[in-house]
Amino acid sequence: MAKNIDQAFQSIRIVGGLLSSKVLQDARRYQLPGQRKEDYAIEPGFTFNEEMGRYWRIAQGRWKEFQQHIERQDLNSHMLAQQEWLLPLLTRVLGYDITPGVTKIIGEREFPITHTAHAGAVPLVLCGADFDLDKGDARFGQEGRKRSPMGLAQEYVNAESHCLWAIVSNGRYLRLLRDNPAMTRPSYIEVDFTKLFEEDNYADFATVWLLLQATRLAPRNHQIEQCWLEQWREKGQDEGERALDKLRYGVADALRELGTGFVAHKKNQALRDKLSNGVLRNL
């Protein structure tokens, strides 16, 4: 499994090839399509820094309150993570309009999605901090079959043609994932909230806000395929392919130069004679 922990992001982990580190860095520098203030629904008269600074303070306060309650045995960890932390984060900080989920049925398969956003276009699986995002649990499965929260979200976006992206979180970690038929090769962006807030990492928070704010996953022209995040992904893939092409041409040029120099060396007269006589071509 490919993992990338870029030094530019201390609390953001890139697993697989969902989005490159460069895309995240470009987002932080406002160098991607759809990064005008109006594209983020920022009111006239306010700047990006003013908005993100306000949301940073709200998130800090919510996280602190969540941490004060998380160890209490008399509270339901599932409800605590949702009500005290994740739903306020998603609605008040990131701007989503969240709807309680219902069990989705596709064919003979059931998907107990906990919440949805953007009129069902973005499924959310939100659970308590005592859930491991990668560990199977009957509450996310079907008829005795266990699923992990991550597995539930991934299987659902793979099966549902109207969805491309999903969000999964247990309150401590949040993952952004996309339709990915290669179930054996996970691909997602993970945010470590504990590290982010304990290290007071505003720069990482700003990147998370620019990446996950509700306008990034909102369908455009009624099509989820045209959302800004999908455009960023495609742009990153195009740039990656061009970089590989340049690398391939560079390697070929280097090999040609190496071969030419080797043949031209004064001690390789015998080799030059064999090449000119066609001896090596017949080997």
Predicted regions and their residues:
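Short, basic/polar, glycine-containing "phosphate-handling" surface segments that engage DNA
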Residues: 1-74, 121-283
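Active-site metal-binding core of divalent-cation-utilizing nuclease and nuclease-like domains
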Residues: 31-40, 44-47, 94-121
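Acidic-basic catalytic patches of nuclease active cores, encompassing PD-(D/E)XK
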Residues: 72-101
